[in-house]
Regions:
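AMP-binding/adenylate-forming catalytic core of the ANL superfamily
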Residues: 1-77
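Conserved C-terminal "lid"/linker of ANL adenylate-forming enzymes
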Residues: 33, 37-38, 49-50, 70-132
Length: 134
């Protein structure tokens, strides 16, 4: 399973645990609170994503943490990594209690598809409403 967890971006091989360890060095993040994986973007390129369980509710502090993590990953690994903050106890785990990167990836993709569907529905509704107004 470890080989398929490997993140390959622009020919660079990055182990997800290296990204996760970098995040876990931050005072707000506990060991086991980060899960890194890659997804294929709309143009077919790989994109690194890190889901991080965050106990912070203050939006300014959350934004600061997101920016700090993004900067650290960029500085350390030279890649653009999307940082997704999620509520605590929401990262999927295996039956033995370990983080499930594939489970986190599936949840992320499911949420993105749901958001895109919502945006599409709102867009269709808005354009239909405009047509009626004309």
């Amino acid at each position: 399973g470890r080989e398929k967890d490997l993140i390959i971006i622009s020919g660079r091989n990055i182990w997800p645990q290296d990204l996760e360890n970098l995040a876990e060095q931050q005072p707000e993040i506990r060991t086991g609170d980060a899960s890194a994986f890659s997804v294929t973007g709309p143009e077919g390129q790989e994109r690194a994503v890190m889901m991080v369980q965050c106990r912070q509710s203050d939006e300014q502090k959350r934004a600061g943490l997101r920016e700090r993590l993004h900067g650290l990953v960029s500085e350390e690994f030279g890649i653009d990594c999307l940082i997704e903050l999620v509520p605590r106890n929401t990262l999927p785990r295996t039956t033995s209690g370990k983080l499930s990167r594939s489970g986190a990836r599936k949840e992320y993709l499911k949420r993105i598809k749901a958001e895109q569907a919502t945006e599409l529905n709102e867009s269709l509704y808005t354009s239909a409403f405009r047509q009626q107004a004309i």
